[in-house]
Swiss-Prot record:
Lineage: Eukaryota, Metazoa, Chordata, Craniata, Vertebrata
Organism listed in the record: Xenopus laevis (African clawed frog)
Protein name: GATA-binding factor 1-A
Gene Ontology process terms (BP): cell fate commitment; erythrocyte differentiation; negative regulation of transcription by RNA polymerase II; positive regulation of transcription by RNA polymerase II
GO cellular component, one term: nucleus
Top-rank taxon, per record: Eukaryota
Amino acid sequence: MDYTTLTTQDPDPNYTESGLASTSEDSQFLYGLGGESSPGHYGGAVSSRAVGGFRHSPVFQTFPLHWPETSAGIPSNLTAYGRSTGTLSFYPSAASALGPITSPPLYSASSFLLGSAPPAEREGSPKFLETLKTERASPLTSDLLPLEPRSPSILQVGYIGGGGQEFSLFQSTEDRECVNCGATVTPLWRRDMSGHYLCNACGLYHKMNGQNRPLIRPKKRLIVSKRAGTQCSNCHTSTTTLWRRNASGDPVCNACGLYYKLHNVNRPLTMKKEGIQTRNRKVSSRSKKKKQLDNPFEPPKAGVEEPSPYPFGPLLFHGQMPPMGHMINPPHHFLQSPRISHSAPAVSYRQAASGVTPP
């Protein structure tokens, strides 16, 4: 859409003193500020309620085409629009039937005229134009809702007739507590039959077993099996990892039962030990590392020769290696010229169907 710049000498005939301006259509124009070097500005009035001459709307949108290069004020001579000669304010305050504009401007006129814009927001960048836009919140009120960027973690909600109120996107839920174990943190909250909150563990336990989850953890299974009044009939011990029975049915400890099973004789009492000796069927990596850390400087065993890390012979340094060009003959396939493989011609579908083979 093209807009022509209106100078101060050509008054607009559409705006008369009769007050017949339309209130339904939006008026848009491009006006200059009186000088050749002055930037042009595009202004659009949301609703024109002109009774006399041209009057500014309560909501006036100003879109500067580029920032002023000078720091001095911009003189304007808009006598045709009912404006006296002077410094033009980019945010004029206009009185209307709806009341004065109480929302503060996004940028003050003094800082806009005297200060220079940052390089990232020059030449009508989208960020700058989006910041200058103002929209009416409601036709019944005069509050303006500035369209400025907000923080992604804070949501600002504007109410009609009131200011914005900040709400956090991550609001904390009500404090919940498991009625069984008293836990306050769980990946999933459940409910019992009466509607009370249960943590995920207590809820699953009650669902599977039909009873409340016990608060005291059960003790681990005892490694040493103890029976009241039970003794080995051979060594008379009452502590063992496994109780067995001999041929006559008498209880025996694990050691005596295994010894009799392997040798068919009773285990001698001289082999009895106070402690229970166990063996590790699989040596864990932790025990290996522990042994290596205990003896890091253990000398090698006598009579055991470690294999050489160089299987092709001792290591030779630079200058000690003899010339070996006359000893090694190049492989035979390196001397032959490379062969060029010719692929068979492709047979098309029509030739295969007709039975004609290519030459």
